[in-house]
Amino acid sequence: MIAIILAGGTGTRLWPYSRNMTPKQFLNLGASQESLFQETSKRLDSLVPPEQIYIVGGDAHEDQLRQQILQIFPDFPIDQLLLEPVGRNTAPAILWSILTIPENNRHDSVVVLASDHSIKNLHSFTHALKLGEKLASSGYIVTFGIKPDRAETGYGYILSLIHI
């Protein structure tokens, strides 16, 4: 499995805590001593080897990305840190990452993760990811989501034909 971590963003929605140079994914907002980006990276530790992780972020945040990923994976291949000169949102970041994957890995399943999610139940996450990988390798497109507790126009909704 290949993992793509989307670590872009300018940090404007969580102002005054986050700023352009310190967006929320680089902040420690939870009980751990790690940033949301580091927590996301760490969730992959037993699932995806560092050489199969790609990180997309803004070139303005190169130092933070490099420092924080090397704290989690000291041998992380820095050439898999993909730096956007200008952010173009989610789809172009995913496409660029996928085009960067070496030819011999292009048949692997790909999981795309936001760097700023807080996931409390690691066991459920790991189970869902392993099951999702199994389904994806059988030709299914898999998406993960949570049941909304209120309407929110800033998010998409999933109409599920199969609930796992």
Where on the chain are the PLM-derived regions?
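Conserved N-terminal catalytic core of the sugar/cofactor nucleotidyltransferase
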Residues: 2-5, 16, 20, 31-111, ...
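Short secondary-structure boundary/capping segments
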Residues: 20-21, 127
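Active-site acidic Asp-centered loop
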Residues: 113-115
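Conserved donor-nucleotide/metal-binding helix-loop-beta segment in metal-dependent transferases, i.e.
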Residues: 123-148
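Proline/glycine-rich low-complexity loops and linkers
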Residues: 145-159
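Conserved small/polar residues in nucleotide/adenosyl-binding loops
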Residues: 162-164
